[in-house]
């Protein structure tokens, strides 16, 4: 029964995404509207759609799984690096690319680079477009593959059928609504992701026996709560987390400066003077969300130790939020529906990869 309710919640969620595409299609009157939403995004939509499309499945699966296996150091230093990268990207790049792209009437990044550097022969256009296509193909494919694996493991769906359904949903709302549909659905996704993180962390703490029980379990593991050591689950020992590891982890934040789907949000905001508001919203949301996601991993390990959910190893640890949500669904129909919404959010984080690649 719980699986049927979960499936209903996921179908409802995906139906809402297609509906957003239909609504947004009525607001597109030219190419500029389709590719940049007519440069009419407000500061909240700009901030939250950028970060939801950026975080994708890493926030709900990668970070909790990392914390579950190794403790605070790896996940927390990553969170700090990503928060700093987010802030600096908004501070350094956002306003300039908004002003220049608008001044040159450029609606895509290759078009912007070509006009910005006087590329009359369109060599820069071809190179930048080729780089985006080449590197976004595996990025997009990973999103489709993740959707297939998620629905297969969660509901027993055929792997290939799940990928096809995911592709149909993406193509429908992207071709109908374009950039505005992608940005609006990402805004909704950011709200649902926030809801999912809050529900899972509160439910997990209660089921673990309280925050005291969670901390007691974590303290018993060597290096688990140490920012300069990491826990090694295989040997139940700790390892050094030194300077070079910290620097390399912090360097994750440098990736933001070249992410096309984030740069397009900068180009699409209605007023460059509102980017300061977007920067604050984005940075705060990213940092808090990553810290909560780290907490879910720590809480999840306690649930495993208590026998409430299975002990996870290796890449299985990335399904910790799925396991907790599935356990939530066993309580009653309302809990099952809430779990379905959470799992729909998880599934949609995989869809944001191909969505932003297409748009």
Residue ranges, per PLM feature:
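Loop-to-helix junctions at membrane interfaces in multi-pass transport proteins
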Residues: 2, 36-41, 45, 62-79, ...
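Transmembrane helix-bundle signature of multi-pass membrane transporters/permeases
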Residues: 50-54, 83, 186, 190, ...
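Residue-level recognition of pore/gate-forming positions within transmembrane alpha-helices
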Residues: 14, 53, 83-86, 132, ...
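Conserved small/polar residues in nucleotide/adenosyl-binding loops
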Residues: 349-355
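Extracellular loop-to-transmembrane helix junctions
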Residues: 2-25, 37, 67-107, 111, ...
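Helix-loop-helix module between adjacent transmembrane segments
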Residues: 77-174, 249-255, 344-348
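Membrane-water interface regions at transmembrane-helix termini and the short interhelical loops
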Residues: 66-72, 93-96, 146-154, 168-190, ...
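Membrane-interface "cap" regions at the ends of multi-pass membrane proteins
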Residues: 1-61, 174-177, 202, 209
């Amino acid at each position: 029964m719980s699986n049927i309710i979960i499936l209903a919640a996921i179908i409802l969620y995906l139906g809402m995404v297609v509906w957003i595409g239909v609504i947004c299609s009525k607001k597109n009157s030219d190419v500029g509207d389709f590719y940049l939403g007519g440069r009419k995004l407000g500061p909240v939509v700009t901030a939250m759609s950028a970060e939801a499309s950026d975080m994708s499945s890493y926030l709900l699966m990668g970070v909790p799984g990392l914390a579950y296996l190794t403790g605070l150091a790896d996940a927390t230093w990553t969170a700090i690096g990503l928060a700093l990268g987010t802030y600096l990207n908004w501070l350094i790049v956002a306003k300039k690319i908004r002003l220049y792209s608008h001044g040159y009437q450029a609606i895509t990044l290759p078009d912007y680079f070509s006009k910005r550097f006087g590329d009359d022969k369109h060599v820069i256009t071809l190179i930048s477009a080729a780089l985006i296509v080449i590197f976004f193909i595996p990025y997009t494919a990973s999103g489709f593959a993740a959707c297939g694996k998620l629905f297969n493991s969660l509901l027993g769906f055929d792997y290939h059928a799940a990928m096809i359904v995911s592709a149909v949903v993406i193509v429908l709302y992207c071709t109908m609504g374009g950039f505005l549909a992608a940005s609006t659905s990402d805004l909704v996704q950011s709200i649902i992701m926030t809801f999912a993180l809050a529900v899972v962390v509160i439910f997990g703490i209660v089921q673990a026996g309280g925050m005291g029980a969670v901390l007691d379990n974590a303290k018993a593991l060597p290096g688990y709560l140490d920012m300069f050591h990491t826990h090694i689950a295989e040997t139940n020992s700790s390892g050094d987390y030194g300077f070079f590891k910290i620097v390399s982890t912090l360097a994750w934040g440098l990736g933001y400066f070249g992410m096309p789907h984030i740069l397009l949000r900068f180009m699409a905001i209605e007023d460059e003077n509102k980017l300061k508001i977007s920067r604050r919203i984005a940075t705060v949301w990213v940092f808090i969300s990553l810290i909560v996601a780290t907490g879910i991993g720590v809480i999840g390990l306690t649930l495993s130790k208590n026998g409430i959910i299975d002990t996870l190893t290796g890449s299985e640890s990335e399904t910790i939020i799925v396991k907790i949500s599935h356990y939530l669904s066993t309580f009653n129909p309302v809990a099952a529906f809430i779990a379905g919404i959470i799992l729909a959010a998880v599934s949609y984080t995989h869809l944001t990869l191909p969505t932003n690649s297409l748009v």
